[in-house]
Amino acid sequence: MDTISQFLTMIRNAGAAKHEKVDMPASKVRAGIAQILVNEGFIRSFKVAKDSKQGIMRVYLKYDEAGGHAINNIDRVSRPGRRVYVKSDKIPTVRSGMGMSIISTSKGIMSGKQATEQKLGGELLATLW
């Protein structure tokens, strides 16, 4: 399993189990995706703690008033065996704007909305709502 899929799966499973936080190995890609999720309001926050190896990233999950997880569904689109690339005018709108897509561009990892505004295409990593 690739690291992005593992990251998304850990968040999905922790949300289903109603955990307050989830710990995982840190990486720059995971930190970039987590920052996008914080900016868009899907998770509360995250922090990276250094250890003797690569570091530990702790993600604090977000729930609504009824106790439901803020992320209803996460889909990994581009995988190591099947890469999916999109142009800036073909970035999908997820759930009529209620969700978001995560794109890896030449300027870094960003939301689909940011990539469209900057007219950047790239690899469509995931969609969520």
Curated annotation (Swiss-Prot):
One of its GO terms (biological process) is translation. It comes from the Bacteria. The keyword Kinase does not apply. Pfam families: Ribosomal_S8. GO terms for cellular component: ribonucleoprotein complex; ribosome. SUPFAM superfamilies: Ribosomal protein S8. GO terms for molecular function: rRNA binding; structural constituent of ribosome. Keywords: Ribonucleoprotein, Ribosomal protein, RNA-binding, rRNA-binding. InterPro entries: Ribosomal_uS8, Ribosomal_uS8_sf. One of the primary rRNA binding proteins, it binds directly to 16S rRNA central domain where it helps coordinate assembly of the platform of the 30S subunit. Part of the 30S ribosomal subunit. Contacts proteins S5 and S12. Belongs to the universal ribosomal protein uS8 family. This is Small ribosomal subunit protein uS8. The lineage of its organism: Bacteria, Pseudomonadati, Bdellovibrionota, Bdellovibrionia, Bdellovibrionales.
